[in-house]
Regions:
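C-terminal accessory regions
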Residues: 1-81, 86-213
Length: 213
């Protein structure tokens, strides 16, 4: 969102520009990744993702969090470090079983604005565009009920849930204490990304499975 437009949106929502930014993916700039910005200060998500692990288009989702009139989506779900919902003790969902796309994919032309800007979205419904439309004519949204998805429920003692809780705390606190030292969140996530990349490149499936309790 351009700075001028961000001011308008923030005013409409009765937020300060900083409060609005904190609710967007760019709010993790300097925490989970280093953002690339244009000359006017606009967050450039596409250029940022060339050097950072983020989901520009697409998001994970918790079927419980998006339910009801007060359902919500978390900006952190657009980070690869979010895999579970600590509040509801379940794994996040990533793909819509109806349209086959990642949630919140919306557009296929690399634009980040919602396809159906004229619609008031419901948090618990999939707004991805359905396929099969003729050129120049969009089909309606997928509209699948995300709240009906069945994802793996996690035991409170699950190491996955414990790891996710740790990551969530780092994102919120912007630092982490390791071996008695205060480590900035951005450094923590750089190391985590490097370790993850090494695992993906060099580890065999058996080696990874053996790490899971």
């Amino acid at each position: 969102i351009e700075p001028v437009r961000k001011d308008v949106v923030a005013h409409t929502l009765r937020l300060t520009p900083d409060e609005l930014a904190a609710r967007l993916l760019e709010g993790f700039d300097g925490i989970a990744f280093d953002a690339v910005r244009s000359t006017d200060g606009t967050f450039d998500a596409h250029r940022t993702r060339m050097g950072a692990w983020i989901y520009v288009s697409g998001s994970h989702a918790c079927p419980d969090c998006v339910a009801g009139t007060e359902g919500y989506w978390r900006a952190a779900w657009k980070l690869p470090w979010s895999a579970a919902c600590v509040k509801h003790r379940r794994m996040l969902a990533s793909d819509c079983p109806a349209c086959g796309s990642r949630f919140a994919s919306w557009r296929r032309d690399r634009q980040v604005q919602p396809v159906y800007g004229y619609m008031v979205p419901e948090a618990g419904r999939c707004l991805n565009a359905r396929g099969g439309g003729t050129r120049g004519h969009r089909t309606g949204p997928c509209d699948h009920d995300i709240t009906t998805l069945d994802t793996l429920q996690l035991d409170p003692s699950s190491p996955v849930l414990q790891a996710q809780a740790w990551v969530d705390v780092v994102l919120e606190a912007r630092h982490v204490i390791i071996a008695g030292e205060c480590v900035p969140a951005i450094q923590f996530f750089r190391i985590l990304r490097g370790f993850s990349a090494l695992m993906l490149y060099a580890a065999t499936p058996k080696e990874i499975i053996d790490l899971v309790p």
